[in-house]
């Protein structure tokens, strides 16, 4: 799978699992993404896909590296519709 394809899949999963905030942008907690069965099957390296999406300014989140458990409550915010 190529990175662009995985980023597009990530956007679809954020739309499926996320909710709109006060700013009108969709977001989902990292822990929700990480523990979702469909996401677990789709992404071999969820953190790497998130990092690639952040670099392309498709999503944003606090920090550089997200770890299961430690960062479960970090919001992953979708910047593009």
UniProtKB/Swiss-Prot annotation:
- Pfam families (UniProt xref): Costars
Source domain of life is Eukaryota
The family database entries (SMART domains) matched by this protein are listed as: Costars (SM01283)
Task: State the similarity comment.
Answer: Belongs to the costars family.
Task: From the Swiss-Prot or TrEMBL record, give the protein name.
Answer: Costars family protein ABRACL
